[in-house]
Every structure is written in C-alpha cells, then in structure tokens.
Amino acid sequence: EGSYAVVAVKDSGEMAAFKESSPLALGISDGELFLASDVTPFLEHTDKAVFLEDGDVVRIEDGNYTIKNDGEDIDREVNHIDWDAEEASKEGHDHFMQKEIKEQPDTVKRAVFQDKSDVEKAIKMIEEADTVYLSGCGTSSYAADLGAKYLREAGYDVISEQSHEMEYWNNHVTEDDLVIAISQSGETADLLSMLEDVDAPVLSIVNVVGSTLARKADHTMYINAGPEIGVASTKAFTAQIAVLKLIGETAETSLKEARNSLINTAGKIEETLEDNEEMVEEVSDYLQGQEHVYFIGRGKGFEVAKESSLKLKELSYIHSESFPGGEFKH
C-alpha cells in the first residue's frame, strides 16, 4: 500500500530496489548501473534507461541486473534518452531557472518539429472524440486551459480541468471522448490517479521519454524541452503551449503553416528576452518588499496571468492572485 521507491544496499555492493506509484529509473552503462527517480542524475554517465513498473523488483550484482514482478522474470525495454548531459548543467548561468528561461526560443522550435504522422494522429483522435478533456496540475493545468482555447478556436468541443478535481467526476468521461494529459515529468501522481478510472483514449503531452504517462497513453507527443532542473517550470510550459497550438493551427490550416507561425513566435520570444533585461531588473527591485501582487488578464492573457502569479508565489513567497479582467471589479 502507499507510494514508495526503495533501494537497499549491502556492504558487498549488491543492491535491490522496488517501487509502487513512485518513479524509479535504472541507468545502464558499460560496467555501471544507476538508480534514480528520473534520468537526470545519471545523464553524464549514460543515455540508456529502464523505467521500472509498479511491483518490479530489480536486483543488481557484479554489474548485472535482473527484474522480477510477482516472482516472474521480466524483460523491460531499454530506452534511449535523447538528452545532452550538458543540458543538465548551468552552463555558466547563475542558476538553472535563468538558463531555462533563456533556452525558450530553442525549446519552442524543438517542440514544433513534430513528426507529421504524430500530429495527424493527434488530430484524428481529437476529431473522433465527442468531447476532448485537457488535464494537468499546476503549471501544466494552465497550459491545458490555454490549449483548450486554441482547440475551441479550431472548432472542437473542449473542457479543461485540473487533474485532482477531474478525478471526482471522471465517471462522466466515456470511451467516445478523449483525454489530453499534460505533464512535464510524466509522473504527476494526481494526473496518473485520475487516468486510472478513465475509459477514454489518452493523448499525452510530456517531456520525459519513457515516463509512466508516456507508457500508459495511447499516443504521446514529446515536447522535447530537455531536462528542466528548476523547480518552477518555464521552458516546459511554453513548449507545452507550442505543441497544443501546433495541433490546433494544423487542424485549421496545415502543419507547414502552423510550424512556420510558431517558429516566428520563437523569434519574438528571443527578442523579448534580449530587449527587456533592464526592465526585468527594475520590476524585480520594485516587487521586493511588496505584500500583495495581482495579475490581471483577459482572454488568453488570463492563463498567462495565472501562470505569472504562480511563478511569483513559488519563487518569492509574495502573496499573489490572478483574475480575469472583467472579474477584478467584482
């Protein structure tokens, strides 16, 4: 019962590990094996990983490993992680979040270079659904809210809801619907729990290759943002939005037009970051010591307001709220 990932080590170096409802990855290199909650800690040593399933017990001895589940030998797939180890370092920046903010022009471009077949399959799943439900937690829930607006503009019946709330009424989701599940890590517990009782097909938008969500989904689109070390999500958020916008725009026009439009957006992100460094310092100085900060937005700007408010709370512990522009006067 419960959620756990446990590693036991003997003096001889022999190890055993098992998991239930918590992520555990086995990194595989020549003569070396690694255990971690995700792949980032061992990226500098190997780009090969096995993602353990619930009930798996892995035993490591003399540079070899075996996996059992319910007493039976299991042969789990070895995944290739297409991340550069340098991406998991600060590369001269003061902190990871600064680095990841500045990576956004590149990560948005990577996010929109999806295989045509993957985009077409996602659109087909959406078109065949009676209702499309977008769901995530925290930052990913705001990406879901914004993505829902993009898909509504393309003419689809779409509802967005935070996963921990959707779990209370997911019995209304039928096999004729579609759930688009959004998560940077692919290990968000509330999201995975909600999906357990859903009969509808699942399209996942996720960053971490081989994660639990990616394995359980009927179809997955990776945002290709690389490792996000900063606790407060930045580049994963914009990459999630880029993929959702790519789907919606492709449905209305073509993949080529949608991709070119978003590549142009990536260029504008780069200009915005370069042109506003001094203003960022000025606003930061002004916010220091403030007790309350309110973010106001209309339309798609409301999702930006919600995410901005969350970022301020996460990083500064300053009280912050967000409101739609029309609601603020009430």
Question: Where in the sequence are the language-model features?
Answer:
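Glycine-rich, flexible loop/turn motifs
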Residues: 31, 45-48, 77-79, 92-93, ...
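Generic beta-strand/beta-sheet core signal
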Residues: 9, 18, 27-29, 36, ...
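Glycine-rich phosphate-binding loops that contact phosphosugars or nucleotide phosphates
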Residues: 124-264, 298, 328
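Conserved short alpha-helical segments that host acidic/polar catalytic motifs at enzyme active sites
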Residues: 1-90, 94, 103, 109-110, ...
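Active-site phosphate/pyrophosphate-binding segments
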Residues: 104-108, 112-133, 219-330
